């Protein structure tokens, strides 16, 4: 109803599907991926990783019937200020960013806890072997063995990188 360009996913099959799934499983959140949702950030990912079951609804075309949103959806999430053909890619981004925070998903669980944005900063530069590649050397501090100084260097580099590339993260 209301006219306008594009098709809208019909309410009846969507409602049947959601109700059928909800009879089998209790969902902590029913999430709709939409450009007009709250922008996904690390805080949302952290919160969702603590939930048990999530049901993610992906729109297509012009979206879904508003009544689905009103009746079933508990959270609306956007991955950015742009439009995709459907919500499937956005849902994949959400699933990947949340799952990696669940204990046992990654081999090194501390890796996810030290990622960019976990402490509000971008990650510092990282290096691999060899120590010298075509005249480009790993910073000397990283080969010093002084763990306290290395950690301070990493913090300083993370802050500086954030200040240069994403100063908006420091304004909060």
What is the predicted role of each segment?
Residues 130-172:
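SAM-dependent methyltransferases
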Residues 1, 56, 78, 142-143, ...:
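Short conserved micro-motifs on helix faces and helix-strand junctions that flank
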Residues 11-12, 66-67, 94-95, 152-154:
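Short hydrophobic alpha-helical segments that form membrane-spanning helices or hydrophobic packing faces
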Residues 1-7:
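Short, His- and charge-rich active-site/binding loops that engage polyanionic ligands
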Residues 89, 101-140:
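Internal, active-site/partner-interface "lid" segment
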Residues 9-60:
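S-adenosyl-L-methionine/SAH cofactor-binding core of RNA-modifying enzymes
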Residues 64, 68-115:
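Structured adenosyl-cofactor binding patch, chiefly the S-adenosyl-L-methionine
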Residues 4, 59, 146:
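Conserved RecA-like P-loop NTPase ATPase core
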